């Protein structure tokens, strides 16, 4: 009945079975049971997905309307180029999601969180490639896939690092003639520059190798082990051998496993229409509030 063991077992079983199993939801932490981040007063934060940090007037109007309708105490821009609605009551979560009409941003989950972008060559005079399109394509390809710990990514349109790709779990940086891929960066309690995995000539190859690494991390890291800790534990050379050696067949196997995992992803906010159990979104029980 270990509170830390249940989420770990739940992740491992889902990773092995590509979510094709019946899960015991009580094994999840409260955030993962209701798909929102619990706050210190027992309310929740809601972060819809904003692909590549790019929104629209229509999305902004809907977010503003939701903030007014549910008297949201704070609307905050996040460091990941998203919008956080703070102070939502548990019983209001399904209605908020319905009114937003946007998919979950998985800000509460051990999963791919965001793919941060700069404006790239579309607007920036220093841009070498289309960082916005690349970031959106990556986020669409990876969204909702669970990982041993949270994964943050970014795409820079040039080496000036405006999207901070050099300190993300996975960072793509446009350089003269191609893309540099960095892995294992961090900018939290510890700051670490990501290691160079490879430099490739095309966006397609950069996305492919990044996805191969992501699946390698999913299969081999310990639960709650961030990418930089995993790389430091096993060594960058070990990771490169697994991810870059096409003759071994391992990269293609990893890609296929990732495709299966991504195909099994369902937006968790759709549970608003079909709750897993009758009190999933009922008023918060005091026992649910973490100490």
Task: Indicate residue ranges for each PLM-predicted region.
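Intrinsically disordered, low-complexity polar/charged tails and linkers
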Residues: 26-41
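Flexible, glycine/charged-enriched surface loops at secondary-structure junctions
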Residues: 19-25, 72-79, 147-151, 219-233, ...
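Conserved active-site/ligand-binding neighborhood in enzyme cores
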Residues: 34, 38, 49-55, 65-66, ...
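Mobile "lid/hinge" segments at catalytic clefts and subdomain interfaces of large enzymes
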Residues: 152, 157, 161, 166-226, ...
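Small-residue-enriched alpha-helical segments and adjacent helix-cap loops
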Residues: 23, 44-180, 275-291
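Compact, charge-rich alpha-helical regulatory domains located at protein termini
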Residues: 1-10
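Generic secondary-structure signature for well-ordered alpha-helical cores
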Residues: 14, 18, 65-72, 101-105, ...
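Charge-rich, low-complexity terminal tails
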Residues: 252-291
